[in-house]
Amino acid sequence: VKDGFLNCLIDKDPKREGFFMTGGIAHKKNYTYGKFEFRIRMDEDPHKSSSGLGLTWPESEKWPDDGENDIYETAHEDNTWNANIHYAVSGKDQKYQQTFHYNKSDWHIVAMEWTPEYIKIYIDNKLVWDLKDPVAITKAPHHLCFQTEKDINKPFTKALKLQVDWAKVYKYVPKK
């Protein structure tokens, strides 16, 4: 944390030539359903070799069986990001993916509402995706994570960061 932001870095490892350091952090509390919301941005990468993520990951660590909800996953190739909902069919990874054409280096408020009936993705308080496939919606407890990734086969010239200004998690309360 620096200057009031969570900074997940990507940089060259100063102690090991040819290696990179990437950052990540995970919330300790797990939730089954809820709303996950955060204000986030990712540095533009001139070499198109990195990615930043805001996601939920299963408490069980059983992937893909217990799902993965990539709420914000920046693309390596361009200045966009995706939401990916991973789930398993016969133990094999399947996913729904939606691409968003917003500048990833600008600040955005991104949210996911996750209920037994749907997953909804919001960008800057606007609903942009509504997924209602019950097979794809995990019932397993998940926790919020932020992380960075680096394609080691592509060039790298400067440190990059995924920044999070704030994050909120709202507990799911079933309707009566």
Residue ranges and their predicted role:
Residues 1-176:
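GH16 jelly-roll
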